[in-house]
Amino acid sequence: PEVYNTAEGFVISEVFFTQMLTTEGKPYLYGQYVIITNNTDNTLYADSLVFLQSANISSLKHDYTKDFRTNSMLAGSLFMIPGKGKDVPVAAGKSIVLALNGKDHSKFVPHGPDLSKANFEIYDISTNRVVDEDQPNVPNLDRWFAKSASITVLHSGGVETYALARIPVSKETYMKDYQYDATYLFKFNTTEKVMTTKGYLVPNSWIIDAVNL
């Protein structure tokens, strides 16, 4: 993986995206999580830190009509850690856990992680029949945007980019001014077609850590 980090001090120290199997051999993705670590000698505050998931997968090459990648990331999902400034302290060398679903997954899959004590969970309001679970004992992240129409999952093939950012404008301003339709030419054998990926641009100057898997 490729890693980018600034001097802010928060880093993505672990991304668990693996697809597990139930005892019946069925795929299980709900035990995914991300660990964010304070990589400094001082207490830092994770309030308003935004977790980003890339709009496109990194295993496919896209020839964009207008290439934004030299100065921005196109995010397909954005989830902010809630807080007013000093509500989420993270001591030096300590970590917080963002869970896809904040429950004990060892009850459902062998060796599944216990995420019932995660600091935050991703919760989506689905627009189709696949409905997310809201665990009452784990606070929800503030969902700004998610590319999935059902529930957010991390790609089990490990072909996405994940990042942490500080967004210096209000949610309303960001959602209005930074929405972006990225067009590219899709080619397969003799077929060519202009495709569009919808997302939100995040300037590189706002990103404090990123992992390109």
Where would I find each of the regions flagged by the language model?
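Activation on beta-sandwich/Ig-like modules and their edge loops
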Residues: V3-L213
